[in-house]
């Protein structure tokens, strides 16, 4: 069974020869692994969550059974470095490079109050030239041999607060500020187009996501989620299924996300990610017993403690345990619960792939 067959068997709830593997790296990890393997290091793509679709050749060499694709900045608006070293993207978000990640520095809609403020803001043009070039290249190279996962994370909530600022946006949700619905409608419009396009290009899984969880709880209550977000996700999922009724919809939310899972299943979710095991209520046994008959599990290998701090033998044993729990009767994609971070040794990364690829 080749990688694509294995991946398709899994997402269609059939038993593969083994669980497929899909990991992602931070750029620092990709660089040190490329040096270790004596292969060229490729810079990350110019994309909102670039790690999901970058370094694919390297990750396939290590053992990934699928590759990621994503929307990229168009030819006429690549991310640009400003005079003070800050970075601006096509949404108008301005970041400050801070070690392993870029941190938000200026929110372009920090002073938003009304729908007029939304109408005046310049949003990305989904039809801009060059946006799909990298996705098309990846599919042309790997589409017949590996699974294709299309990234559409920061689907609504996160893009909204990236524009406004987290504290203000959460407060304005509670205050029912005038601009909230127009802003969410505009983001929904753009990301629905992106999702439909990536399905048309040949994606097998559309990987949506917003982080609704914290380590111990949720960032908002279910009432707020059901008022502002769930109806929009329902509409988006319907649009995606119109393009391809067989597309599998994955949802990423870091943290203690389990209270939201039934609502997502109700509106058509197929795959849950990233299964952050140290977050409250995200223990593998609990998730499998509650939702194992309804969703595919994608993730679950701890990047907070297991991969950086344990021995290779401990890592291998824990991955076998994850496969035995989540993968019983199929339905599991072996993956870290986030990008593998730079505090993880080469030895432990190799141990992850070695154990993940075993039958």
Indicate where each model-derived feature is located:
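Short, structured active-site "lid" loops
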Residues: 42-47, 52
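Catalytic and substrate-binding clefts that recognize carbohydrates or anionic sugar/phosphate headgroups
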Residues: 107
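Catalytic domains of carbohydrate-active enzymes, especially glycoside hydrolases
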Residues: 51-70, 200
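Short acidic, Pro/Gly- and aromatic-enriched capping/linker segments at domain boundaries
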Residues: 69-86
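Active-site loop segments of alpha/beta catalytic cores
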Residues: 1-44, 88, 97, 101-103, ...
């Amino acid at each position: 069974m080749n990688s694509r067959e294995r991946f398709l068997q899994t997402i269609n709830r059939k038993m593969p020869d083994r669980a497929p593997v899909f990991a992602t790296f931070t750029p620092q990890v990709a660089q040190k692994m490329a040096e270790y393997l004596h292969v060229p290091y490729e810079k990350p793509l110019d994309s909102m969550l670039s790690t999901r679709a970058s370094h694919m050749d390297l990750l396939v060499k290590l053992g990934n059974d699928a590759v990621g694709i994503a929307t990229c900045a168009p030819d006429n608006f690549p991310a640009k470095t400003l005079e003070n070293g800050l970075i601006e993207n096509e949404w108008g978000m301005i970041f400050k490079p801070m070690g392993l990640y870029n941190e938000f520095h200026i929110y372009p809609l920090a002073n938003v109050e009304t729908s007029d403020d939304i109408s005046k803001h310049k949003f990305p043009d989904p039809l801009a030239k060059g946006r799909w070039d990298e996705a098309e290249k990846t599919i042309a190279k790997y589409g017949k041999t590996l699974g294709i996962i299309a990234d559409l994370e920061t689907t609504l909530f996160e893009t909204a607060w990236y524009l406004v600022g987290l504290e203000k946006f959460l407060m304005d949700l509670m205050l029912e500020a005038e601009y909230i619905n127009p802003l969410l409608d505009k983001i929904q419009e753009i990301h629905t187009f992106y999702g439909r396009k990536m399905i048309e290009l040949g994606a097998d899984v559309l990987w949506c996501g917003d982080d609704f969880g914290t380590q111990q709880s949720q960032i908002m209550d279910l009432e707020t989620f059901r008022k502002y977000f769930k109806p929009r996700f329902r509409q988006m999922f319907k649009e995606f299924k119109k393009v391809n009724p067989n597309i599998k919809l994955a949802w990423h939310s870091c943290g203690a996300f389990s209270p939201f899972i039934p609502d997502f299943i109700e509106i058509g979710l197929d795959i849950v990610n990233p299964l952050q095991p140290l977050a409250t209520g995200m223990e593998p046994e609990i998730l499998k017993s509650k939702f194992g008959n309804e969703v595919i599990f994608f993730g679950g290998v701890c990047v907070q403690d297991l991969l950086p701090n344990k021995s290779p033998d401990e890592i291998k044993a824990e991955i076998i345990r994850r496969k035995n729990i989540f993968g019983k009767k199929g339905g599991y994609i072996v993956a870290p619960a986030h990008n593998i971070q730079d505090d993880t040794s080469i030895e432990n990364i190799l141990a992850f792939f070695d154990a993940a690829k075993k039958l």
